[in-house]
Amino acid sequence: MAPLSLTDIVSALPSEEDAWGPPVPTGNHLDGVPYAPFSKGDKLGRMADWGADSKDSRERGRQAYNRNYRDQQVYGAGTSSLFAVQVAEDESSFSVVDNTRTSVKTRGFGRGGGTIFRGRGQRGGAQRGRGGAFQRPAGGRGGQAGGDRYYDQRGGRGNRGRRFGWKDYDKPQRNRDSSVAIRPEWSMLEEIDFSRLSKLNLETPDGEDLDNYGFLYYYDRSYDKAPVKNTERRLRALERAAYNVTTSADPVIQELAEKDEATVFATADILSMLMCASRSVYSWDIVIVKHGNKIYFDKRDNASIDLVTVNENAADAPMEASEGQAKHDSINTPGALALEATIINHNFALQTVVESDSAKVEFSHPNPFYNPSEETEPLASKGFKYRRFDLSLEKDEEPVQIIVRTEIDAVLKNNISGEDQHVTLKALNEFDHKAQGAGGALDWRSKLYSQRGAVVATEMKNNNVKLARWTTQAILAKSDVMKLGFVTRANPRSATAHMILGVIGYKPREFALQMNLNMANGWGIVRTIIDLVNSLDARDEEEGDDAQEDKIKKYILVKDPNKSVVRLYSVPANTFEEEDDTGAKAEKDEESEEKDEE
């Protein structure tokens, strides 16, 4: 076969009329009907709309992804919005309803609104005769505002929003005041942050009972039953003599110190605050007195450590009233809520026992603070157990032991064994679950028994330090049962009337596990403070100071109001004694006025 030439190949190509490919003209009729080969909803004149949101920038989620997977430029995708009409917002019918709450200025608890309870400290004791905790706050006869200084002061801010700037997350959003004014003559010796406190650990054996004082009534089991709707019991105010004397003014502790039964002395309410220090938010202070080789953990009169805080650990804790709202004497400020909760706890422990002289448990000795010749009110059900704990280590040359005055509120018969069980009575209070500072709490009236676990879990979150202190006090006293009462306001806008919605019982050790409370960590904190105070004395001796057995040194441990640190200050030996004398004089004047009015 002869080879093909280029001319033969070109001549074999089809002619120009029969060129390869689709025909150039396209028909615009389909069965005689004209049509346009595009959708009316598509935007003409552009290849793509780059201003529209793509599928990647629209809302996430599988349903949204499946619904919006196709882009807007897909053929026919714009038909849905072809005839859409943009309706303008009609604001002619818009109106604002004034729903601001105004609290009516009401008379506070006791005389003048500022009294918690009439101070009934130890009378005729060896040292300071008065030491009752239920006394008049610093506000005196002026009203409830006196207790507010122990908590965050945010007056003047109002409802204005904040502008957050650089590193605002690391700054305290609420400036609170210290529980005690730091004086210029005080010298700071040590500063310990909470991260260091939380790492301390000291395994301590169970304590031993040294002596018991007082008596106990039996707990009323009817409060354990779920109340029928609209039949809740009203919390009553009972006039009973109750005492919360500081450590150094306790005559029993003074006697034990003279016998050298231990080297460290404290009360359960003071010690529980120290053991749960890393959970606290508000400021508090503890006075430490070193008398020779003895250490006393004391508290000031009218100190914040005696008040029961409310929602201290909530993410949005209760706020102080602004300058405009302060005129209405708001009842939901931290100080007012703490005063209300303290009174509720006092009355709840008195009301939930059956007062019967024929059915009560007498301890070995009578109440050491009650004087029948001076008191006109009957004595409240209270048992004081003085217990000793060993905090010694193997390296210690001398044993380190602490004596703690613990408290029991009632006694309960065991249903199986019939033995008497010691009971600790405490009360949680609800002020308004819709108000600011409620911490997302549920409505107790409708959810307490249907969602008990959720209610208790919320309280553990909002009142972590308060529940931890109560549990620590129950464990220190070796209580068998801890009863938690749930008390709410009869009217959310009034703090004068309360209803008991129910009572739930727990074993203290089990409740401590639920809230991750480690007693070994608490004992480690106590031992650290004891070693720190002893080391300061040793340092003074090395510097040449005269060491006298009867020399008194005083320190104060203060929790910073805005930071998670505690500071130890050295203060003069006569610090706070002038305040005690002034308070005693004011109390005498008040009692004389009451007699004149009668």
Swiss-Prot record:
Belongs to the eIF-3 subunit D family. mRNA cap-binding component of the eukaryotic translation initiation factor 3 (eIF-3) complex, which is involved in protein synthesis of a specialized repertoire of mRNAs and, together with other initiation factors, stimulates binding of mRNA and methionyl-tRNAi to the 40S ribosome. The eIF-3 complex specifically targets and initiates translation of a subset of mRNAs involved in cell proliferation. In the eIF-3 complex, eif3d specifically recognizes and binds the 7-methylguanosine cap of a subset of mRNAs. Residues 104-178, 574-598 are annotated as: Disordered. It holds the Pfam family eIF-3_zeta. Residues 109-132 have a biased composition (Gly residues). Residues 165-177 have a biased composition (Basic and acidic residues). It comes from Coccidioides immitis (strain RS). The RNA gate region regulates mRNA cap recognition to prevent promiscuous mRNA-binding before assembly of eif3d into the full eukaryotic translation initiation factor 3 (eIF-3) complex. Residues 304-318 are annotated as: RNA gate. This is Eukaryotic translation initiation factor 3 subunit D. The keyword Metal-binding does not apply. GO terms for biological process: cap-dependent translational initiation; formation of cytoplasmic translation initiation complex.
